[in-house]
Amino acid sequence: MSKVIILGSGAAPGVPSLAYGFGDCDPKEEKNIRLRSGTYMEISGVKLLIDTSPDLRMQLILSNIRDVDAVFYTHAHADHLHGIDDLREINRITGRAIELFASPENLSVIRTRFPYLIVEKGEDVDPVYRAALHPNAFEYEKSFYFRELKVTPIKLQGHNVECSGYIFNDGEVVHISDFRDI
């Protein structure tokens, strides 16, 4: 049985936003306070995140998540990526590296923005002092396994940057975001 927790579903600035507040949303409705995009899943014994929003620390605290095996990135916009540094806390708790999966284009952006977080496999690093994220690039439409989890990355169309969707275990769970066409 899969477990899926939506950590955030708000737009890039979150809801309420600094500029527009709640907009058309009712501020009295608790569900209208929305953190930025993020999803946690447990599938086939794998604990994974989709994206790391700037709200990641609070998302993990509020959902009592203290272990992550892998992170799958949809794209390299700040609202989906810039909480990546908070993964150091997971490294400290578990004492091990986290696998990071992204398209070659998005992985290149991550390496450029956050070089201090990337550790090549086999490199000896103490995760208490430094994050340990192992980079893994994939090809679209080519399935691969991470442990017992089958992953098929798909390229989404219509966003202003390359965006990835994921099919897990032949459709047991599918995650897509920020797209206009598939």
Q: Which residue ranges define each predicted feature?
A:
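Binuclear metal-dependent hydrolase catalytic cores
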Residues: 1-174, 180-182
